[in-house]
C-alpha cells in the first residue's frame, strides 16, 4: 500500500481553521435563536395593523345610535343584517340558501291583553270594571257571572306550618281571590320566598280553581305587567288587581274576559358560504349581531331610557367575524384552503339563543361534513395589562388542549374551560355533537348598559385574537373527534338536586323541552333524550321552564320519583333517582 503525504501551506490551514470556527459559531448562534424563531412564528401576523382600522370602522357603525341597539325584529336589526350582507357580497361569498344571505325565524315578542279583556265585579245587579291586568302564566277564558272564594295567601306549606287549604279539596271552578303578600308566622325561621304568585296560581289551578285574582300586598308584591312568553299559559285566567276589592253585604259575582294577543316578530340570521370544494370539511365561524335596543329586555341599567349600543356585546365579535371572512376569502395560503367556511351572524341571542337554535333546527344545517364551530362573543375588551383570553369548549374535542396551548401567542394568557354549554350561540352547535370553541375577552362594568360604546374597545387586542384564531385554523386537523363535556359549574345552586339536562329556553308549548342531556346524570341514566318534553316530575306538573324549576325544588338528593315525558307523540314514564 502506497502512502501519500500531502503538505498544506500554513495560510491554507489558517483559512480552513477560520472557516470551521465560523461554522461552529453560526451553528451555536442558530441553536440559540431557535426559541426566538419559534416565538416569531407564533407571532406570525395573518391580520396586519390595517385590520385594527377596519374593526374600529365596522364596530363604530354597528354600535352607532343610528342602529338603535340592533334589537331582534327592529329596523336597527335590518340595518345591521343589510350591512353584513353587503360585506359578504363584496367578498363574493355565496348565500347558504336561495339568493339572500338572510334566513328568517319567527318568535313571540310579547303577550298583551286584547282590547276586550276585562274583569268586572257584579253586586246588586251592577257591574264595575276592576283596575286589573293579566300576569305571566295567564290563560284565556270567558267566565260570565262566576262565584268566588277568598283563599288567603293561597299557600300550602306544611314545613313552615301554614296552609290555606285545610278544608278545601276541590275549588269547583270558582274564581279564587289570593292576597299577594306573605303570611306572618310565629316561627322565626319560616320562609315563604319560594311561594311566588306563579307557584300559588299553579297550586290553585291543580285544586280546581276556574281563575285566580291576586290583590293587595306591598308595591314590591305587584307583578310585572309584561307577560313572559316563555311561561306557558295555565288553563285558567290569572290576573292582578291594583285597587282594593269592592266590599258588599250582598252576594257578588265576578265576570272575566281573559282574551290575549300574542305579538309575533321576525328575526334574521345572516349566513354566507365560502365553498372551495364540496368534498372538503366545513368550518363555521359565527357571532351574534343583535343587542338590547333601548333596553327593553335584559338591561342592567337603572337610569332613564337609553340606547344600548352593544359595542363589545357583540359588535366586537361581529366585526371580527367579518375580518376573518375577508381574510379567508382572499388568502392563497394553502393551510386555509383545506376547508370550506360558513360565516353566520346570529340574531336573537340576547332573547335566548333564538337565532342559533332556529338555524340548527332548520334545513340549512346538516351535521355531516361539519368540522367545528368557532363563536366570538364579546372579544373587544382584552385587558392591556392582563391580556387574558377566555376560551370555552376546550373539552369538546380531545385535540383542542394541545392545539390551543402549542399555538398560544407570546404575551397572551389563555384561560380555558371544558364545557360546550354556555350563554352564547356555540351551545346550539355543541348540542348537535359538534366540537366548539367560544372566544371571550371577559366581562366588565359596561355589560348590558348604554355605556358599552365603541371608544371602550381594544382594537389591537381584537386583531391579536383574530390572528390566534387563524393560527388555530391553519393547524386544525381535517378530522376532529367530538367529546361530550360536563355541564359548567354555576356556583352554589339554589336547587338541592339536578336532573342533568339543558332546557330549551325558546320552547313555547306545554312542558319543558330538553335541548341536551349530560352523560352520567339522572336524566341520562333514566333514559331521557334530547327533544323529550318533560310534563311531570313526581306529583308535580311541569307546564314550562318555571314549573320545571319549581318541581326540582321539591326534591332532595337520593329521592326517587318518576318523570313523565312526551317523546314525539308518545307519552312515556321513567323512574329517576336524584343526585
Give the label of every model feature segment.
Residues 65-182, 260:
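Noncatalytic luminal/extracellular "stalk/propeptide" segments of secretory-pathway proteins
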Residues 141-142, 238, 346-441, 458-460:
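Metal-dependent peptidase/peptidase-like ectodomains
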Residues 525-545:
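Conserved PDZ fold ligand-binding element
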